[in-house]
Amino acid sequence: MEIVHVCIQALSHYIFSTTEKNIRNEVVLITGSGRGLGQQMAILFAKRGAIVVLCDSPDIGNSETLELISSINNEKRVHAYTCDIGNRVEVKLLVERIQTEVGNITMLVNNATVLTSNSILDMSEDEFSRSLNANLFSAYWLIRQILPSMMRRNHGHIITMLGSTAVFGLGNFSAVCTAKSGLVGLMESIDHELTLGGYDGIYTTAAVSHYLTTHLFQLSKTCFNPVIPPLTLDYAAKKIMHAILINRKFVCVPRLYYLIPFVKGILPARAFLIILNTLVNPKIPIYTQHELSSKHNLTSSTQHIPRKRSHMSACQ
């Protein structure tokens, strides 16, 4: 009966809850804020009176976002930092500096993404490791640094941005798919730990979105078929922001993505692949075992695997 009661309560909250919480004076750290979705989210947070802390890689920077927010908000309420989030030491120093110069971070938005597009056999182990550091371990490092101050006050919100690669794997995107699906498990685990610990004032939100009209889409659009057009940044950001403000644990934009786990569960694997190939370009090389052995000399003790060019960026 308790399960039924909780389900009814959750359904009622999902349908009827429209009261958005006040985030004025919350200190919000947003990674990958230099452009794309991170920039759009930063603007929305600033419009609601939050103290916005921008963070992006040195090669991208935050000058454009800083200028946009400064025209909305007082300059003293926006702070900009650069950091290689794939570097554990830099992440640690970043958080310590923010806590000293700005204050305790009460909202964390894990948005930064490094997109690497390579076949699993054409990607070096170092490339795969760097992708995991930037896309998965960066969120882990940030949460480990920031969560203790949230727990002391029983107040905070951890948000993680996920793309479509969090709900289904795509050929030639093994590194980012591994990282993003790992983030789903990380967020669910953290939420469970907070519940077990009685921290009812700390919330988590995982946001899955369809691909967006950003520079990453321009880099990777040859991989996708235009069955479902990309979402605009403004639309996606507003939907995700609303979910954050009503403390929703999981949000999909568009809602069609809620059906993907269900469809994967009931359809034969080959049937789901047919659906997947209507969304993405199915021209992924498929080799027989003999062809693989010949192409990559897998029986040899030393392998030389040719590397393709990869597209990398620091924000969505």
Q: What are the functions of these language-model segments?
A:
Residues M1-N25, I274-Q316:
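Non-catalytic terminal and boundary segments that flank Rossmann-like NAD(P)-dependent oxidoreductase
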Residues H13-V53:
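Canonical Rossmann dinucleotide-binding motif of NAD(H)/NADP(H)-dependent dehydrogenases/reductases
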Residues R48-E64:
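Conserved glycine-rich Rossmann-like NAD(P)H-binding loop of the short-chain dehydrogenase/reductase
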Residues D59-I60, Y81-L93, E125:
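The beta1-alpha1 cofactor-binding region of Rossmann-like NAD(H)/NADP(H)-dependent oxidoreductases
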Residues S119-I120, E127-S129:
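Substrate-binding pocket helix/loop in short-chain dehydrogenase/reductase
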Residues I143, A179:
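Active-site helix of classical SDR
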Residues E193-Y257:
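SDR active-site lid
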